[in-house]
Amino acid sequence: MSEPEVTYSTVRLHKSSGLQKLVRHEETQGPREVGNRKCSAPWQLIVKALGILCFLLLVTVAVLAVKIFQYNQHKQEINETLNHHHNCSNMQRAFNLKEEMLTNKSIDCRPSNETLEYIKREQDRWDSKTKTVLDSSRDTGRGVKYWFCYSTKCYYFIMNKTTWSGCKANCQHYSVPILKIEDEDELKFLQRHVIPENYWIGLSYDKKKKEWAWIDNGPSKLDMKIRKMNFKSRGCVFLSKARIEDIDCNIPYYCICGKKLDKFPD
């Protein structure tokens, strides 16, 4: 009997493509992870270094900002000081200029002051001479008690009591009109110097014009004051040391005549 024939075969198992990829991935993954672990250490150092640099930069920027702020403040203080000094200098120059102008003005006014003093001396001399001349003729026997002059005007006081019309006639007898008071200064002057009596003056009520009028029908700086007195249109006005007032023209009072001088005595 013959021996059976034995046949040998080699069985080869082929890995599937998915399994091959998995094996290959595992084979390659191992070395990469090792490489990553080796490379991560230098990067961490770099990141830390960059963080430190950023921190230093922030600190530097903060310090610079503080320095710039302090510099600006210091600069502003210096500018304010300079401006204050400049303003003080301007004020000092202006003060010096005004002082110089006042000095020059006072120098310029000296001739005017000297002129005014001269005029006053001459006026006083003229007043004294005029009063002396007129006083020497005061006793005329016609009722003139006294007279005197002030500035460019002479005043005649007739001390015979009469009506306003009689006063006007007596003044005309001396070729001097009944007194017209030019302004409030003259009024105050007369009230200081007259004897305490009542005196007719040249102001009466014009019934035709229905207004108060002076003897020459001219204006006076006293008109406004008279209008404020609200006279009652009773006829005529008299003067006393205390007031001027309207009253019946037929009441007898003393009389004041007044005239401006045309020529100064030498």
Curated annotation (Swiss-Prot):
InterPro entries: C-type_lectin-like, C-type_lectin-like/link_sf, CTDL_fold, Ly49_N, Mouse_KLRs, NKR-like_CTLD. Changing I251Q: No effect on MHC class I peptide tetramer binding. Residues 150-258 form the C-type lectin domain. Changing P219Q: In strain: C57BL/6, C57BL/6 X BALB/c and NZB. Changing I195P: Greatly reduces MHC class I peptide tetramer binding. Changing S175G: Increases stability. Increases stability and improves binding to MHC I class ligand. Changing S2N: In strain: C57BL/6 and C57BL/6 X BALB/c. Changing V34A: In strain: C57BL/6, C57BL/6 X BALB/c and NZB. Its main location: membrane. Changing K161R: No effect on MHC class I peptide tetramer binding. One of its GO terms (cellular component) is plasma membrane. Residues 147-151 are annotated as: Involved in dimerization. Residues 1-48 are cytoplasmic. Changing K260R: In strain: NZB. Residues 70-266 are extracellular. Signal peptide: none annotated. The chain crosses the membrane at residues 49-69. The keyword Transferase does not apply. Residues 160-162, 195-196, 207-208, 224-233, 240-245 are annotated as: Implicated in MHC class I binding. CDD domains: CLECT_NK_receptors_like. Changing D248N: No effect on MHC class I peptide tetramer binding. PANTHER family: KILLER CELL LECTIN-LIKE RECEPTOR 2, KILLER CELL LECTIN-LIKE RECEPTOR 3-RELATED. Receptor on natural killer (NK) cells for class I MHC. This is Killer cell lectin-like receptor 3. The lineage of its organism: Eukaryota, Metazoa, Chordata, Craniata, Vertebrata.
